[in-house]
Regions:
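Conserved phosphate-interacting/catalytic interface
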Residues: 59
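Polytopic alpha-helical membrane-helix bundles and their juxtamembrane interface segments
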Residues: 1-54, 62-219
């Protein structure tokens, strides 16, 4: 893949479009997190945690792509760790938001513990293997595919979340196919645009707390 760069204030910024779209995503997620955090209901507050983690992950992406040849090796590794760990924790928050919305107390407790076990396994595997993207993708798929299914069935608001998460996971196809318009709009940039749409949809569905009703999937 052909690399691009610009110089800002004497600092060489590599992949400026990729870094810039990461920054926009970080701001977008931070705004959603701040808005949802003020809600009294647990569902939007947990989705606020999801967006807070995604804001940190995408902010780390600014450094990972923009300063990858400028940062010292130790600092760059730290950025990779932040990006990976926050991505895993964001999946955990998404799981909790769905569990607390659609499951009753005993089931919710059991599923919450299962989600915590998944997070611990992911973190332990990351310590052993390092911040591997393949590991993060696997953890995300295992955690979010059930979330998509239950959000789609649980309440009207959950449909927005389900579609948003499906779009987010669908960006993997863009990465695999390496869909690109050119060096200044590569497959990562296109994936970032789709992620922006994904976050918009998730935020719309997260604003309203889903009631626990008889007959919902996890009752």
């Amino acid at each position: 893949m052909e690399t691009t760069s610009i110089e800002l204030g004497g600092v060489l910024i590599q992949a400026p479009v990729t870094s810039g779209t990461n920054l926009l995503l970080a701001v977008q997620c931070a705004v959603y997190s701040a808005r949802l955090r003020t809600d009294a209901e647990p569902r939007p507050r947990l989705w606020a945690g999801f967006f807070a983690m995604m804001s940190l992950a995408t902010l780390a992406g600014v450094l990972k792509h923009g300063l990858r040849d400028t940062l010292p090796d130790g600092a760059f590794l730290g950025v990779l760790w932040i990006s990976s760990v926050t991505g895993g924790v964001s999946t955990y928050y998404a799981q909790l938001a769905t569990i607390r919305s659609h499951a009753r107390d005993a089931t919710a407790l059991l599923l919450s513990r299962a989600a915590l076990v998944q997070l611990v396994v992911f973190l332990a595997a990351s310590v052993g293997l390092g911040p591997e993207m393949t590991l993060l993708i696997a953890d995300t798929a295992i955690g979010l595919l059930p979330v998509i299914w239950f959000e789609a069935r649980g309440c009207p608001e959950g449909g927005w979340v389900a579609v948003g998460l499906a779009v987010s996971i669908g960006t993997a196809a863009v990465y695999i196919a390496r869909l690109s318009v050119g060096p200044w709009l590569n497959h990562i940039d296109i994936a970032h645009a789709l992620m922006g749409v994904s976050f918009l949809l998730i935020a719309r569905g997260a604003r309203a707390a889903a009631p626990r009703q008889e007959g919902v999937p996890w009752s």
